[in-house]
Amino acid sequence: MSLPDAAIDGRLLESARRHFLEKGFLNAQLKDICDDADVTTGALYKRYRGKEELFDALVADTLREIEESISQRAGIDLHTVSDQALAGAWANTYDGVMEWFSFCNAHRDGFVLLVRCAAGTRYGNFLHDFCAHMTEIDYQWLVEM
């Protein structure tokens, strides 16, 4: 029995990333992704159940990093924070905004895939869902204050 070619994974993901960024999820074709990666569709289906699972693989790291970042910020015990620190948390400081921009830039392709290219996937409402999630976190934070 032959061993799976690990190089195929990287080629498939890179090809899928290019096609999804260029055409969006709905217009990207698995045949084109496979042709550009120089693999058969059978090789793709040995690794992924379909196009959406391939898309999931591309955005998984970005989603995980977003959740980790949110968890770190939301996990602060408000009873141990000074009034000055609480007031500062509401200020959109230059450093805070630049930190968020740097985060987005470091995960640029993942964000573009989620915000602009995800129609037809379970992430099709990512921007709305993300804003609603952040609003709920802020609301809970206010309730606890």
Where are the regions that the model predicts?
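N-terminal intrinsically disordered/low-complexity leader segments
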Residues: 1-5, 78
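Helix-turn-helix
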Residues: 11, 15, 19-53, 57
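Short, basic, alpha-helical segments at the C-terminal edge of helix-turn-helix-like DNA-binding modules
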Residues: 30, 60-67, 71
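Alpha-helical DNA-contacting segments of helix-turn-helix folds
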Residues: 56-62, 126
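Hydrophobic alpha-helical connector segments
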Residues: 57, 71-105
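Amphipathic alpha-helical packing segments from all-alpha helical-bundle domains
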Residues: 91, 95-106, 120-145
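Short, hydrophobic secondary-structure boundary micro-motifs
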Residues: 112-115
